[in-house]
């Protein structure tokens, strides 16, 4: 039988100590590797989450910008609609005021004399009928009498603001109405009124 010399505990500690330390070192390496993997996975997940969040923030920003642009367009469109409505009302009120005051305006009488005289002169006196606003019927008859055109038919037409339409014997019509002047000048008038009201 073999004889063991020395302290058996010390021998056991010495024999077991090396494998134990090696095992502990491997466990520590595995723990560090695991921590490193967890840390890398965390960083990767954090980076991916940050990218998703940034992407969603950018999408939200773009949507918000789109909504803002749409709202701006709607506001501008509505503002233009309101401006156009206001300008239309102002033009109508100005025409109504003109209709009320024109009978006493010497310049209006002169305008009628000039256009009726011109129409009679250009047509060689073949004026068949004159259409005018109801409130102008009397003044038109006076002007025609002054021009020696007493036999010309005069017809009052609702919707004429002022001026006259001259129908010639051969069927041609000469439109000297305020309506016609306004229609030709309306885009310019609208711009001028808008500028005066909204850009001053």
UniProtKB/Swiss-Prot annotation:
One of its GO terms (biological process) is proton motive force-driven plasma membrane ATP synthesis. Pfam families: vATP-synt_E (PF01991). It is found in: Cell membrane. GO terms for cellular component: plasma membrane; proton-transporting two-sector ATPase complex, catalytic domain. The keyword Cell membrane applies. It is a peripheral membrane protein. The keyword Transport applies. Keywords: ATP synthesis, Cell membrane, Hydrogen ion transport, Ion transport, Membrane, Transport. GO terms for molecular function: ATP binding; proton-transporting ATP synthase activity, rotational mechanism; proton-transporting ATPase activity, rotational mechanism. Has multiple subunits with at least A(3), B(3), C, D, E, F, H, I and proteolipid K(x). Component of the A-type ATP synthase that produces ATP from ADP in the presence of a proton gradient across the membrane. Belongs to the V-ATPase E subunit family. This is A-type ATP synthase subunit E. It comes from Aeropyrum pernix (strain ATCC 700893 / DSM 11879 / JCM 9820 / NBRC 100138 / K1).
């Amino acid at each position: 039988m073999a004889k063991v010399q020395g302290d058996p505990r010390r021998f056991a500690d010495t024999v077991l100590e090396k494998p134990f330390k090696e095992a502990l070192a491997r466990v520590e390496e595995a723990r560090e590797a695991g921590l490193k993997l967890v840390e890398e996975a965390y960083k990767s997940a954090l980076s991916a989450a940050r990218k998703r969040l940034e992407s969603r923030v950018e999408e939200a920003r773009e949507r918000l910008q789109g909504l803002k642009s749409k709202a701006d367009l709607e506001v501008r469109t509505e503002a233009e609609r309101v401006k156009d409505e206001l300008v239309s009302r102002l033009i109508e009120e100005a025409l109504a005021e003109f209709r009320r005051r024109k009978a006493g305006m010497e310049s209006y009488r002169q305008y009628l004399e000039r256009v009726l005289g011109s129409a009679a002169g250009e047509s060689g006196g073949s004026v068949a009928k004159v259409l005018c606003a109801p409130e102008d019927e009397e003044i038109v008859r006076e002007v025609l009498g002054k021009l020696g055109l007493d036999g010309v038919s005069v017809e009052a037409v609702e919707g004429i603001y002022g001026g006259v339409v001259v129908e010639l014997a051969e069927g041609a019509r000469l439109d000297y109405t305020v309506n016609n002047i306004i229609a030709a000048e309306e885009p310019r008038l609208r711009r001028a009124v808008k500028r005066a009201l909204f850009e001053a």
